Amino acid sequence: MKKAGFLFLAVMAIVVMSLNAKDPNVLRKIVFEKCLPNYEKNQNPSPCIEVKPDAGYVVLKDINGPLQYLLMPTTHISGIESPLLLDPSTPNFFYLSWQARDFMSKKYGQPIPDYAISLTINSSKGRSQNHFHIHISCISLEARKQLDNNLKKINSRWSPLPGGLNGHKYLARRVTESELVQKSPFVMLNKEVPNAYKRMGDYGLAVVQQSDNSFVLLATQFNPLTLNRASAEEIQDHECAILH
């Protein structure tokens, strides 16, 4: 009974946090009612900083943090649970986000080292917006240290990251840049992690570069018992302490 009671309270806490969120369609409105129309009419991406209709994405400066950006599709994709992300014709949004990291350096006024950058997408239960968006921002000092300490323990198969991150369990998988270019992390998660294909919306996903120039994919799964909303954004620090 105690376990059932705790589970109920945990679920209710997550529900309350979700209900407190602001309009979940703000980003979708910005893309389809502002950025795209302004670009099509005036060749001006504002309020986005980049609009690429042919490539299928836009980039927007987020209001949170001095250097955080969001990459979003120009089609209606709600989030990580969308089957469209598994379609071969869908752009490789994670790799496009990695290429868009240069906007951080331009805003900062000098080159930002790749080890300081991270890309994340939250689960359907760990996000506040219902339009697909990848957070391009700094990695937290704690997450960077944890990944550095486990560099040699991360291999090309999904396996638990020793110690997890932010008190939550994570799976980690090493990929080369060539693999990241050729295959979407969403497809790798869906096809390679047991039963992930059944509950893609329960996962948060992140991409971070390692000191050996490989990349690590990080996946965390929604778990109400540990109050894990699978918000992979938790490994980021939008104030960018890693740069100071």
UniProtKB/Swiss-Prot annotation:
Q: Which domain of life is it from?
A: Bacteria
What InterPro entries does this protein's entry cite?
A: CDP-diacylglyc_Pase, CDP-diacylglyc_Pase_proteobac, HIT-like_sf
Kindly name one Pfam family recorded for this protein: CDH
Q: What is the organism of origin for this protein?
A: Helicobacter pylori (strain ATCC 700392 / 26695) (Campylobacter pylori)
| Primary residence | membrane
Keyword terms, alphabetized = Cell inner membrane, Cell membrane, Hydrolase, Lipid biosynthesis, Lipid metabolism, Membrane, Phospholipid biosynthesis, Phospholipid metabolism, Transmembrane, Transmembrane helix
What's the EC number here?
Answer: 3.6.1.26
Would you tell me the Gene Ontology cellular component terms? plasma membrane
Q: What general EC class does the enzyme of this chain belong to?
A: hydrolase
GO MF terms listed in the record are: CDP-diacylglycerol diphosphatase activity
Kindly give the Gene3D superfamilies that the UniProt entry links to this protein. HIT family - CDH-like (3.30.428.30)
Family membership noted in the UniProt record = Belongs to the Cdh family.
Record's catalysed reaction(s):
a CDP-1,2-diacyl-sn-glycerol + H2O = a 1,2-diacyl-sn-glycero-3-phosphate + CMP + 2 H(+)
Q: What GO biological process, any one, is recorded here? A: phospholipid biosynthetic process
Could you tell me what this protein is called? CDP-diacylglycerol pyrophosphatase
